[in-house]
């Protein structure tokens, strides 16, 4: 796979996960607060959905943050730009698409159980995706790339620190 394909894969996976999660949360909030249709589960069912959704959200968030903490230093230590990019693309794809699935599942639990707490947990998961979004400079720092490697990847889109000092 070519280097540009890895960067496109990183952007596409992150955008799909982030915008899908944001759309799911917004649609759930609209359905939950604006829609005239309601589900009325029993109190027992509602409580179990709240517990299951909360446990799922907390486990998914903690595992995602743990994976970010453990994987990024390992990727930085690896040799070769191709290896770093392929590992990072796989890491971003699994992180964002897994969190998209978790957010959608939490939103389904929110609609079926009518629990506002689950909607807030879905918003926290989406906020985590926003904060972990891989832009050009974040990729440089997380993978430990040099300015030459970044210019070979992004061309004119990348502005090195030395370029700003000259102007």
Where are the regions a protein language model picked out?
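Alpha-helical transmembrane segments and their membrane-interface junctions
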Residues: 99-121
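Select subsegments of transmembrane alpha-helices in polytopic membrane proteins
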Residues: 14-24, 90-99
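Alpha-helical transmembrane segments and their immediate juxtamembrane interface regions
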Residues: 123-159
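Membrane-helix interface/capping segments
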Residues: 64-84
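Membrane-interface helix termini and inter-helical loops of multi-pass transporters
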Residues: 34-44
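Short, Lys/Arg-rich, polar N-terminal cytosolic tail immediately upstream
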Residues: 1-7
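Cytosolic juxtamembrane regulatory segments of multi-pass membrane proteins
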Residues: 87-95, 151-167
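Alpha-helical transmembrane segments
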Residues: 45-61
